[in-house]
């Protein structure tokens, strides 16, 4: 993979500006609702990243819509365009289950992958840009950061792109995760992480191992894009997000130890929040407008107390909004879709394509096309999608089609469903499965059903009827009409000869 070189977020913004992918907004704009409205209109039009240089009431600029197009996601992952993200997926598939070289020629072919692994270790710095300014104790005031309020009925300002860094008591490597954080005081945020997410698991293990002790947490804002995207990519459990970011960037990820704890944060981050979670301290979070297009219900989550704020000189606050697709998470889903395909194909070689339509909230519905090889094959693939990667444990609907269907064309998919499916025979319903906490359609919070649709041609054993033969054109006739098509002038005002 030929990486697009950048060292930090500011380098990346310079790169975007050179390519016409960044717009500076000098007009004063309010972080309360107004930035969301502008960013939403811009994203829906496929517009640039936005740097609001004069947010009303604040001296700190706000960066929004950074990953508002698949192209910018690809650029953030070191690639020129979205199609190149298949190579990222192939690398992840290799790292997930590396195969030893079969001989000298195979070793030579795999050499680029082995060389990339050299960029995996982090580089620890003693001093770092993210610690150029340090605020602690009573001077900590999160209200000085232009935290956005995105929707009219949101409970409070919300940090959306915080890269939360944690470490469990029995783990060597840290976990990086993106969890939203509600502002509830000058030094307090609500850490909304679901119980199965890495940060929450680290916290649960800490509470069991160290009853009553404070759990150290740090949150990086404005890290370099490779590190941010590493936190939302299906990285193998044996690989740290920092290591993966190094692979994407082509250089080792630079980190620095926090001022108040032993966690390591991206050295070039714009802002770092350091602090702790007091065991048992929780607060009601929400409601907030979410990526589903609805306000979610209120629930209790741990409170994150901020003891230190470190930042760069002239720091930039990186933010986003979530709402009914398309939004930034939906765009990320479109780009990361290309990363998923090679990973799935490594486990299931019969998969031809895999598509997560953004209008399905990026993960709730999947369309898979396969080279079908036996009766019941489609059902095996459904079960594989639901179980192989944890990213798809919340996928409610899986549609499986043959490889003559374009998974990304609804006309094709609907045709396959309506001509190759019997609703009773070809629908799989699975009850009492993990479901997204935000899915209010499920009968119980976090627990619901899944549906698989087998829209493949049926094999012997799956049907007793003679199966339909698809209509195919005569290639000789097609070639002849191609040759005389322009002469026919059907779509021209002139008359045919």
UniProtKB/Swiss-Prot annotation:
Residues given in the record as Mn(2+) binding sites: 175, 241
Keyword field: Cell membrane, Decarboxylase, Flavoprotein, FMN, Lyase, Manganese, Membrane, Metal-binding, Ubiquinone biosynthesis
Cofactor entry: prenylated FMN; Mn(2+)
Membrane topology listed for this record: Peripheral membrane protein
Enzyme class: lyase
Modulation of this protein's activity: Requires phospholipid, a metal ion, dithiothreitol and at least one other so far unidentified soluble cofactor for maximal activity. Inhibited by EDTA.
Keyword Plastid: no
Reactions performed catalytically: a 4-hydroxy-3-(all-trans-polyprenyl)benzoate + H(+) = a 2-(all-trans-polyprenyl)phenol + CO2
An example molecular function term from Gene Ontology annotations: manganese ion binding
Locations listed in the record: Cell membrane
Domain of life: Bacteria
Role noted for this protein: Catalyzes the decarboxylation of 3-octaprenyl-4-hydroxy benzoate to 2-octaprenylphenol, an intermediate step in ubiquinone biosynthesis.
Assembly behavior: Homohexamer.
NCBIfam families the record matches: PRK10922.1 (NF008175), UbiD family decarboxylase (TIGR00148)
PANTHER family assigned: 3-OCTAPRENYL-4-HYDROXYBENZOATE CARBOXY-LYASE-RELATED, FERULIC ACID DECARBOXYLASE 1
Entry protein name: 3-octaprenyl-4-hydroxybenzoate carboxy-lyase
Organism: Escherichia coli (strain K12)
Lineage of the species this protein comes from: Bacteria, Pseudomonadati, Pseudomonadota, Gammaproteobacteria, Enterobacterales
Annotated gene: ubiD
């Amino acid at each position: 993979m030929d990486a697009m070189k950048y060292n930090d977020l500011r380098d990346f913004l310079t790169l975007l500006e050179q390519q016409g992918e960044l717009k500076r907004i000098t007009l004063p704009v309010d972080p309360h609702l107004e930035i969301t409205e502008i960013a939403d209109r811009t994203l829906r039009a496929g517009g640039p990243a936005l740097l609001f240089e004069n947010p009303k009431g604040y001296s700190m600029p706000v960066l929004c819509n950074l990953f508002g197009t698949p192209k910018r996601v690809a650029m953030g992952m070191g690639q020129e365009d979205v199609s190149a993200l298949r190579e990222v997926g192939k690398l992840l598939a290799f790292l997930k289950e590396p195969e030893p070289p079969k001989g000298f020629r195979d070793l030579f072919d795999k050499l680029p992958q082995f060389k990339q692994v050299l960029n995996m270790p982090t580089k620890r710095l003693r001093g770092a840009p993210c610690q150029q300014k340090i605020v602690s104790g009573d001077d900590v005031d999160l209200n000085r950061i232009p935290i956005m309020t995105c929707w009219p009925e949101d409970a409070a300002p919300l940090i959306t792109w915080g890269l939360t860094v944690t470490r469990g008591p029995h783990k060597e490597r840290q976990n990086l995760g993106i969890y939203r954080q509600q502002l509830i005081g000058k030094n307090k945020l609500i850490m909304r992480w679901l119980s199965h997410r890495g940060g929450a698991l680290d916290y649960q293990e800490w509470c069991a191992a160290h009853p009553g002790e404070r759990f150290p947490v740090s949150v990086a804002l404005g890290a370099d894009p490779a590190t941010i995207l590493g936190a939302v990519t299906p990285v193998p459990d044996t690989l740290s997000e920092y290591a993966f970011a190094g692979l994407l960037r082509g250089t080792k990820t630079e980190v620095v130890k926090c001022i108040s704890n032993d966690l390591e944060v991206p050295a070039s981050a714009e802002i770092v929040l350091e602090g702790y979670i007091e065991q048992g301290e929780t607060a009601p979070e929400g409601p907030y407008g979410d990526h589903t297009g609805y306000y979610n219900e209120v629930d209790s989550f741990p409170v994150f107390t901020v003891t230190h704020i470190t930042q760069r000189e002239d720091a930039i606050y990186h933010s986003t909004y979530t709402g009914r697709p398309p939004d930034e998470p939906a765009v990320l889903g479109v780009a990361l879709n290309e990363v998923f395909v090679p990973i799935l194909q490594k486990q299931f070689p019969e998969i031809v394509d895999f598509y997560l339509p953004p209008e399905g909230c990026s993960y709730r519905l999947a369309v898979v096309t396969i080279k079908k090889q036996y009766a019941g094959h489609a059902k095996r693939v459904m079960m594989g999608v639901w179980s192989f990667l944890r990213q798809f444990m919340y996928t409610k609907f899986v549609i499986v089609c043959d490889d003559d269907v374009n998974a990304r064309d609804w006309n094709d998919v609907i045709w396959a469903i309506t001509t190759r499916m019997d609703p009773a025979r070809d629908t799989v319903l699975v009850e009492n499965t993990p479901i997204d906490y935000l899915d209010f359609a499920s009968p119980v919070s976090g627990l619901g059903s899944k549906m698989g649709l087998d829209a493949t041609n049926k094999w012997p054993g799956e049907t007793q009827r003679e199966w339909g033969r698809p209509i195919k054109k005569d290639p000789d006739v097609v070639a002849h009409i191609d040759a005389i098509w322009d002469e026919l002038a059907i779509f021209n005002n002139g008359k045919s000869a």
